[in-house]
Amino acid sequence: MVSVIVINYNTFELTAACLRSIYTYTREVSFEVILVDNASTERDPGDFLLEFPLLKLVRSDKNLGFAGGNNLGIRQAAGDHLLLLNSDTELREDSISIALKTLQTKKAVGFVGCRMEYPNGRVQYTARRFRSISWELMDLFRFIPALMPAEQRAERMLGKYFRHDRSLECDWLNGAFLLFERALLDQFPKKKLDDRFFMYAEDQLWCEQATERGRHNYFLADTTIVHVNSGSSSIRQQLSNRLTMYRHELAILKRRKGLGIYYWIFMVIFGFKEYARNAIKWFYFQLTGRLIR
């Protein structure tokens, strides 16, 4: 059985649409849905049960964030397989069953993620490589990857350099859809998802921890879901969230590489590149009211 865990925080309509899509499209596998409400104030979470009476509703008396909320849901889960699914996603087919088949047939898989699109149909960059000095330099000086053959560039860089049109192993996956075996948590610190981050970049941390334990993470292009992305955040908050994510990514690199010369060189390159881009995006937002993704 698959236990699908969804976190709700003041996104009642988005969450209801997500739940509706799960119950509509999931046909080939037994499943349960656990909804963790992170102390929402927008509406009584008990209203979800009016439309979804089979739902397991878990109420938290405070906002535990993404990792903390999922750990709370996992404690209530009965499945051998766990799916973390963002509340601002919608299934368009039986993506859970398709992903489960991949998890069960591939060897030594940590997490399985799937292809995602924005509501307008544009693909999201959900399969990525871990950050490194070489990756940051190639991303900064884009004429370098431009000189590579297209397939080589896509596989080496992933992210925005990859069309997400084929399934492959990757370093880390977007946490909006993460399927894994419950047994994987037995190998994790404290036998749970690492919750040192309240929100943002925790998916990268978990994928790194799975890799350290001999697992690989797999991007599945055979099924697609819709992901609003930051559905519970305003546009201004999204820009602020990016800065938080960058700080967390630096903390992850520090964990992996330590505080030696590699970390400091990386921080200079990464900081210059990402903070400059964020400043441009903020300036553009001030002028137009629109966010560059």
Segments from the language model and where they lie:
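Glycine-rich, basic loop-to-helix element that forms the pyrophosphate-binding segment
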Residues: P45, R59-A77, I98
